[in-house]
Amino acid sequence: MRKGIQPALEQYLVTAGGGEGAAVVAAAAAASMDKRALLASPGFAAAAAPGTYIQILTTNPSTTSCATSLQSGALTAGPLLPSVPGTEPAASSLYTTPQGPSSRVGLLQQPPAPGRGGGGGPPAKRRLELGESGHQYLSDGLKTPKGKGRAALRSPDSPKTPKSPSEKTRYDTSLGLLTKKFIQLLSQSPDGVLDLNKAAEVLKVQKRRIYDITNVLEGIHLIKKKSKNNVQWMGCSLSEDGGMLAQCQGLSKEVTELSQEEKKLDELIQSCTLDLKLLTEDSENQRLAYVTYQDIRKISGLKDQTVIVVKAPPETRLEVPDSIESLQIHLASTQGPIEVYLCPEETETHRPMKTNNQDHNGNIPKPTSKDLASNNSGHSDCSVSTANLSPLASPANLLQQTEDQIPSNLEGPFVNLLPPLLQEDYLLSLGEEEGISDLFDAYDLEKLPLVEDFMCS
């Protein structure tokens, strides 16, 4: 303490850190206060809880005391911080976050910087201006940050301003549209050679945009540099009269038409398959599931044509090779035999008539030997009818055919196309009503070999 200077009132502030303990404020004269006696007093130690942080503020920079942390009654010394004379701040609100005008801290005194001529002048003071409205960052209020390219908000009632006709859209200035115009100039140029300076003038664009197009086209080998400012087209022909481009367009159109036709055929096949399924599964249609000879001949498309009827088991394989000269059909089946019939043309003289024995297909069953005997007994004469003997007009037919192979009616609707059996496969025999003369009535007995010849052989 300097001589001649009135001692100032000092303030000793003791606060409890960590939210524990209470603040103890003691004020005394600097000359008569013993700091060490105050910290060591029993009442002061009892008021502070363990872990309490003690800070003492004083105006005398030479005064050495301590800011201690009490741990189970132990006390350690530390440096002191000066306080502001003439102020008595509340211990509960000091060094806390300010909440408004009521919690403002008046003055906070800082210790003088060392080396200022012995500290003779008044200490430096700094005022904390936190404002009346609280935190300094909240004093201006919340503001939305402004975006650099954000458009101004438009009220819903304000009408949209239409663009003027002179303004160009983004597509008009795009590089793709410019490339199409550049290709049109190439197609109109002779021999596919184009001057880039002329192209820039015609298209009314900068020359660097033309270079952007030529660099890409040259990279994919569609053009090549003829000279400094001339390029030549290297792709397909661009003329409309002919060339590869017109041919490709024609082929694309043809493929589209064929695809539509194929789609139409697929729909027809599905429709026919569904109709056939409904016809075959219906019980009312099963009794009518047959085709007669008259039904086949009534088809106008089969008029004056040879009709072959194939009766084959299920899963029969039919192959028709692509041949221009002659038509061939290959049939193969592993489920059973295949029967092939020729459907002859219908004539006026020999019109088939349905009899009592004729089935619903128009076919007449083959008569047995008993039926032939009953028919022969009904006639007055004993001779065999000419109609039954007509196929036996020659000896060759007699030797190659038997009774079961002789057709009962030559006017039948179908003719069997199977090859006849060989002579060794026939067993000649006579019926019950036939005699030995029936075997030789059509033969010339003079031409028959003698019995001796049979004996010698």
Curated annotation (Swiss-Prot):
Subcellular localization(s) per the UniProt record: Nucleus
Keyword Nucleus on entry: yes
Positions of the UniProt region annotated as Disordered: 80-171, 350-387
Covalent S-S links between cysteines: none
Region (Cyclin A/CDK2 binding): 96-145
Molecular-function annotations in GO: DNA binding; DNA-binding transcription activator activity, RNA polymerase II-specific; DNA-binding transcription factor activity; protein dimerization activity; RNA polymerase II cis-regulatory region sequence-specific DNA binding
Transactivation, as annotated region: 383-457
Compositionally biased spans, kind Polar residues: 93-102, 371-387
CC annotations in GO: cytosol; nucleoplasm; RNA polymerase II transcription regulator complex
UniProt entry keywords in alphabetical sequence: Activator, Cell cycle, DNA-binding, Nucleus, Transcription, Transcription regulation
The protein's role, per its UniProt record: Transcription activator that binds DNA cooperatively with DP proteins through the E2 recognition site, 5'-TTTC[CG]CGC-3' found in the promoter region of a number of genes whose products are involved in cell cycle regulation or in DNA replication. The DRTF1/E2F complex functions in the control of cell-cycle progression from G1 to S phase. E2F3 binds specifically to RB1 in a cell-cycle dependent manner. Inhibits adipogenesis, probably through the repression of CEBPA binding to its target gene promoters.
Family named by the database record: Belongs to the E2F/DP family.
Protein name: Transcription factor E2F3
